[in-house]
Amino acid sequence: MISIPKTLKQAALPVLMLLMGPGVARADMCNAKFFHDGGIIEIAGSGIFSINAKMAFSQVKKSNAEVCQAKVRGFANYSLMGMFTGANELDHLMLINGSKSSLTKIAPGKSPDAATFDLRMLNIFGYGAPIQSAGQRFPAQSFRLDLGDPSQATTPLTVRTGEKTVGARQSIQTALGQQSCWPVRYARNTDATVANLRGITIPVPPIQSQITDWFCPQANLVMKQEVEHAGQRGVIEVKSVK
């Protein structure tokens, strides 16, 4: 395992976050259990990467049931592909207006850099529109993020998620108890590239994964994400919601 110095933390974490997929808020997110001053979401996962993260909500303002905002702060400790380890602080502004949302990195005196960190890639907040029935589809997406030491030349990493397909609703066990949740299945792939780590060029192989998100309407969250990569399985779960 390689411990990443501080200059690499912001560059390595997006790779982990992009594996979790992009997401935006649902229209009823303003009334979610966690959307209040002092609200907390904790997640943990293992597999091709492991993660422990905590997000805290503060300065919550609600204009009505569909328009609200909050500061989202916290931290994430992670290990990716057995090569990258590190920790990052989370500091974002979350704005919700109906079925749309935005998450902006807070960086006083600097321009927010979505390529180095973007909390939207956690995907736990859903797909931007309510799930109505099995067979419903959400469009494919692609992203381009910088990989490598930001103090040196970086390499763009392309990530593609295939079309998402909703399966039949099922009852699953979650940290909030038994819930009726929608499975949302899709492929997620990254292209092969190279990254500069402490002045050493390291090849990064392509990553091809099959994903199943379990979106639970009662919680307004993807409470569990199952990841299959090269015959190995991993799980990312919401462990606590307050």
Q: Model-predicted segments: where are they?
A:
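Bacterial N-terminal signal peptides that target proteins for export
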Residues: 2-15
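Sec/Tat signal peptide C-region and signal peptidase I cleavage site
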Residues: 23-27
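Acidic, serine/threonine-rich low-complexity disordered tracts
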Residues: 28-107, 147-242
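Extracellular-facing segments of soluble proteins and assemblies that are Gly/Ser/Thr-biased and enriched
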Residues: 104-156, 161
